[in-house]
Amino acid sequence: MFISSSSLAMIVETGRNGSEPVARIQYGQLYLIGSPQKDIVTEYAQERTHQQPENPFASLIPDQTIAIIPSFTLESGETLHNVPLAYSTRGRLSPNRDNAMVICHALTGSADVSDWWGPLLGGPGRAFDISRFFVICMNSLGSPYGSASPVTCKDGNPENGRYGPEFPLTTIRDDVKYGMYPC
């Protein structure tokens, strides 16, 4: 189930390069195509938490993980390298992988679901019941709280300086593809 805080829209399918889908939702179940045994972050993504010295905002979000995507091509055709993707999870993914709930944050939000939807997150009786669901929230492109944004270093290299106003324009499609990349 994919929930957007602005539209509560369901996203049915997306692909890494706009061609083959990496995940789909069918009859309420999340299917990771091609690799049902892989975890949310796979072998090609390095994991690090709170280790972005160039980005002081990344450490403001407790309990998030930052995966590094080696290469990511935007809808515009521009390719970013060593792209950080911050995300947080609550609950446990079931062996059948049929209990995933992906929540997208608002434009100015972060991957910390409990910060902005706290009253809905918890145990039985809550909308986001983490005793039943595996809740994951990925930080959107352009948000400074750990994901690729104007405050991150170009290509992940501090010697290149920060993107600043040169950070490329992104689309909702880019965010969907970016959020599904580690699957």
Predicted regions and their residues:
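Catalytic-loop region of hydrolases
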Residues: 2-3, 7-100
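Short, solvent-exposed coil/turn linker segments
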Residues: 23, 68-69, 110, 129, ...
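Generic structural hydrophobic/aromatic packing signal, biased to beta-strands
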Residues: 67-69, 104, 136-138, 175, ...
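Catalytic micro-motifs at enzyme active sites that drive phosphoryl/nucleotidyl and oxygen chemistry
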Residues: 74-77, 122-126, 181-182
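Conserved phosphate-coordination/catalytic loops
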Residues: 81, 170-173
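N-terminal cap/lid subdomain of alpha/beta-hydrolase-fold enzymes
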Residues: 88-156
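Conserved acidic catalytic loop of the alpha/beta-hydrolase fold
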Residues: 158-162, 166, 173-183
